[in-house]
Amino acid sequence: MLVHGAWADTSSWDGEVSALMQLGYSVRAVANPLENLTTDSEYVSAFLDTIPGPIVLVGHSYGGSVITNAAAGNPNVEALVYVDAAAPAVGETNGSFSGADSVLKRKPEDELFDKLPYPGAPPGAVELYLRKDVFLDHFGNDLPAEVATRLWATQRAASTSAFETPSRFAAWETIPSWYFISSGDQIITATSERAMAERAGSHVTVFDGGSHLTLISHPEAVTDVIEQAIDSVRQ
C-alpha cells in the first residue's frame, strides 16, 4: 500500500502502481488527508484494516510520518518503505526533519508558501500551497518544466497542523524498513534521511541525483526498492 506526501496526491505513485501491477502484485494507493498526523494516520490505519496481509507499506515525504504511526500494532504490516521520507520517533514532528540544508529552512515561509485559512482548522492552523518557483526549482526540479508546472497547479494543500503534530508511534522500531534516499532531494535532504535510516536500522538505497519527486521522475528505481521489501516478506 502506497501513501503519498504533502503537496501531492495518489497520482504521484502512478509509475510504481503500473510497474507493480504488471509484476502481479495487488496494489492500493490511499488518499492521505494531509490535515493532522494523528487523524491522517488513523485514516490510513483504518484503510489497512480492510486489506489482508502480508502488507508492505510505503510512504513518500510526509507519508513516511503517516506510515510510521499507521502501521503500529498492525500484525499484517511486515515491511515499511520510506521514499525520500520522514521517519519520526515518538514525540517528534514531521516539520523537524527537513534538515538544516533544506530549502524549507533556508527561505522565509512567505517565500515558500501561499497560506489559506480553512473551515474547521485548529487554532492558528492554515493550509499551505508551495509557491510555483519553489515547486519547480526545489521540489520537482529534476522533472521537465511542463510536468512540474502541471503538478504545481494540481497540488493538494497540506495543513500546518500536519507538520506540527507529534508522532505517537514509531513502527520502524519493530517492523523491518527500507529507505530510498535521493541525493538531490532539497526538501528532506539526504543528510537528514541518512540519519533517520541509520536510527531505524533500515536497508538503504541512495539514488544519485533526483529530487523530492524522484518517485515520479524515476519510478523504476523506487519500484526496485519496494520489490526488495516484498521479497523479504515472501521469504
Feature locations, PLM:
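Conserved HGGG/HGGXW glycine-rich cap/lid loop of the alpha/beta-hydrolase fold
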Residues: M1-L37, I55, G73-N76
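Conserved acidic catalytic loop of the alpha/beta-hydrolase fold
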Residues: T39-I55
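Gly/Ala-rich beta-loop-alpha elbow adjacent to hydrolase catalytic centers
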Residues: V58-G63, I67
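Flexible "cap/lid" loop of the alpha/beta hydrolase fold
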Residues: N76-V77, V81-P123, S159
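Active-site nucleophile elbow and catalytic-triad environment of alpha/beta-hydrolase enzymes
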Residues: R150-A171
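Short beta-strand/loop motif that positions the catalytic acidic residue
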Residues: Y179-I181
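Conserved loop-alpha-helix segment in the C-terminal half of the alpha/beta-hydrolase fold
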Residues: S183-G210, I216, Q228
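Post-His helix in hydrolase/transferase enzymes
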Residues: I216-S232
